[in-house]
């Protein structure tokens, strides 16, 4: 889902889907104009989704609060790959 401009509302919808998704292991939301609100929604979803192992949030509009929320959500998940730069 690279560069689709989903924004915070789209990220919130993706987060709801992640909460009940038993198969998706990698997700790229690279360059989608996602801000802190969207990142926080994704972070909440990651807390209940043990299947996802890689998440690319590079080149969005994440502030420190959004980045930290996602990092905190996966901090105890060994091997989780997270990209939040750009």
Predicted regions and their residues:
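Leucine-rich tandem repeat or coiled-coil scaffolds
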Residues: 1-86
């Amino acid at each position: 889902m690279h560069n689709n401009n989903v924004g915070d509302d789209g990220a919130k919808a993706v987060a709801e889907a992640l909460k009940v998704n038993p198969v998706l292991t990698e997700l790229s939301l690279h360059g989608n104009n996602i801000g802190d609100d969207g990142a926080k929604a994704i972070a909440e979803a990651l807390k209940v989704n043990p299947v996802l192992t890689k998440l690319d949030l590079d080149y969005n509009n994440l502030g420190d609060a959004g980045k930290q929320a996602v990092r905190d959500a996966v901090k105890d998940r060994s091997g989780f790959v997270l990209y939040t730069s750009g």
